[in-house]
């Protein structure tokens, strides 16, 4: 449970320190109890400020200090879906998460109101101390509060870094990185037929290598930078998506020693990010800031060349870059891994997809990006993977800047609002076979053929919708499509021998965080089919 995770964190803080530090921590814990009680009283949805409004229904069983935390299991997206089914109304439910009243949105109609109708009121973000540290005072596009700076940063990213033109211009780099992975798999399959490969490592490495190449240019493998950036990205994502006590008890931010203990790991990671970025910026300065063809510029050089035009500070640029690494690598990797996992558990889908890809691709070469337009089932498979396994179960929290009314209930100013994207995509009132992996739903003759995953259809919002929609959606999908198509084209895939013998399925268990990661690594056996020539 989330609460247990918090207790575990405090236990580690006390145990892994010197006696003097332990005494200080214990003193802080005593102060913590007092602060928590005060925070719960001042921020509770039962306070006078909240009582004057007609609020969404709330589950029974709220406890002092912790609120409804004890009702939230290890998979909060599932807990909130189930709690809403019992106690929510019109897509809304109010839960007290520690000292923080939080509105949970669980139906498309309510999500439409939050992400579109009242988007101007709900487009901001609640303060996140960990993001403030890792994302340079939250000056990235994802965590920055809604306002002048966010609009400027968003314009820079949309217009210059992740525009359709820029995504298209990176096709050569994508295809080259895919070619390297295919060659690596082919070499392994020829050297040791029947040996299972660590697909989690291969797919994560591909996503990291391509994103690093787009951001850093040809220097992305210098001194193992691609691996270091991947490590930092995974660590940062774990910190941002973990149980951070100060998120649920904001008054603890006033306790300096406690905040230092909680944020120590984030500060350590931030220093490593900063060291890398300073090294990159120094190299740029030594090179005189020259980068050749404008259309092939990496994101670091582009941002630095735009710095004066948009009034960006060096920390602003660093914050945007951290966001680029974390969002692009994590999303692309997870979609690829979940897609391959589902294909192995649904061999009829794999066979159908393989037939499409091999028919659409001329023999003797790799799948190229121009071939993808002839692969509707590939696109449907990726969409279905993202429907049933959205990379982020919750959209990043929204924050109301003014009172607004949704479905007859008031959302007071200063309220945290969470959209349960996982619940929307599995809502049985909106989807046939909601719990099944069924790509055919998105084909031309399917019921959901017109469903869009870029924010137009509110039932399916893996990238969000409205003002805060993810700017990197097309970048991520382009990264996924070309890799998945080539994996399916070049190889026949099997489970490890024992799993094939027993008919075992890939374990789809996942672990909650800012993203949903599978708990087990994916191991698969590649076979080189006779019908596909080496390319």
Curated annotation (Swiss-Prot):
InterPro entries: Cyt_P450, Cyt_P450_CS, Cyt_P450_E_grp-I, Cyt_P450_sf. Keywords: Heme, Iron, Membrane, Metal-binding, Monooxygenase, NAD, Oxidoreductase, Transmembrane, Transmembrane helix. SUPFAM superfamilies: Cytochrome P450 (SSF48264). Its main location: membrane. It is a multi-pass membrane protein. The keyword RNA-binding does not apply. The chain crosses the membrane at residues 14-34, 469-489. Pathway: Secondary metabolite biosynthesis; 2,4-dihydroxy-1,4-benzoxazin-3-one biosynthesis; 2,4-dihydroxy-1,4-benzoxazin-3-one from indoleglycerol phosphate: step 4/5. Its cofactor is heme. Pfam families: p450. Belongs to the cytochrome P450 family. This is 3-hydroxyindolin-2-one monooxygenase.
């Amino acid at each position: 449970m989330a609460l247990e995770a918090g207790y575990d964190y405090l236990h580690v803080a006390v145990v892994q320190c010197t006696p003097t530090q332990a005494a200080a921590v214990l003193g802080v814990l005593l102060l913590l109890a007092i602060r928590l009680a005060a925070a719960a009283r001042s921020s509770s949805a039962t306070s006078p400020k909240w009582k004057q409004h007609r609020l969404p229904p709330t589950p029974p069983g709220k406890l002092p200090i912790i609120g409804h935390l004890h009702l939230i299991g290890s998979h909060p997206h599932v807990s909130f879906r189930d709690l809403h089914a019992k106690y929510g109304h019109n897509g809304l439910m109010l839960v007290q998460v520690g000292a923080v009243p939080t509105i949970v949105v669980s139906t498309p109609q309510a999500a439409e109101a939050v992400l579109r109708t009242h988007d101007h009121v709900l487009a901001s973000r609640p303060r996140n101390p960990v993001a403030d540290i890792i994302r340079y005072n939250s000056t990235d596009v994802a965590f920055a509060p809604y306002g002048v700076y966010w609009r400027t940063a968003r314009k820079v990213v949309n217009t210059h870094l992740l525009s359709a033109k820029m995504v298209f211009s990176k096709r050569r780099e994508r295809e080259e990185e895919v070619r390297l992975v295919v060659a690596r798999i082919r070499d392994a399959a020829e050297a040791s037929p029947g040996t299972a490969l660590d697909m989690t490592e291969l797919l994560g490495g591909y996503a990291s290598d391509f994103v690093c190449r787009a951001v850093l240019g040809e220097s992305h493998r210098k001194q193992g930078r691609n691996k270091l950036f991947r490590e930092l990205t995974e660590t940062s994502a774990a910190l941002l998506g973990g149980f951070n006590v100060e998120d649920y008890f904001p008054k603890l931010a006033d306790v300096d020693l406690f905040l230092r203990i909680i944020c120590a790991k984030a500060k350590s990671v931030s220093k490593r990010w900063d060291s890398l970025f300073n090294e990159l910026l120094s190299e740029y300065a030594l090179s005189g800031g020259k980068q050749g063809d404008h259309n092939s510029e990496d994101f670091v050089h582009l941002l630095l060349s735009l710095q004066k035009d948009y009034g960006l500070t060096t920390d602003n640029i660093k914050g945007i870059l951290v966001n680029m690494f974390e969002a692009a690598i994590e999303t692309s990797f997870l979609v690829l891994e979940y897609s391959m996992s589902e294909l192995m558990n649904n061999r009829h889908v794999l066979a159908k997809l393989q037939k499409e890809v091999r028919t659409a691709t001329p023999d003797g070469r790799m799948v190229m990006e121009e071939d993808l337009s002839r692969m509707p089932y590939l696109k449907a498979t990726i969409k279905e993977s993202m429907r049933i396994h959205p990379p982020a179960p919750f959209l990043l929290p929204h924050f109301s800047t003014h009172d607004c009314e949704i479905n007859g209930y008031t959302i007071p100013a200063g309220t945290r609002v969470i959209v349960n994207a996982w619940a929307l995509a599995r809502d049985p009132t909106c989807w046939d076979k909601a719990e099944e992996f069924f790509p055919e739903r998105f084909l031309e003759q399917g019921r959901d053929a017109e469903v869009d995953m870029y924010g137009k259809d509110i039932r399916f919002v893996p990238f969000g919708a409205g003002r805060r929609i993810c700017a990197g959606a097309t970048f991520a999908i382009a990264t996924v499509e070309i890799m998945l198509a080539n994996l399916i084209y070049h190889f026949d895939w099997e489970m490890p021998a024992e799993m094939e013998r027993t008919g075992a399925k890939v374990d789809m268990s996942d672990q909650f965080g800012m993203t949903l990661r599978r708990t087990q690594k994916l191991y698969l056996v590649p076979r080189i089919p006779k019908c596909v020539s080496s390319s």
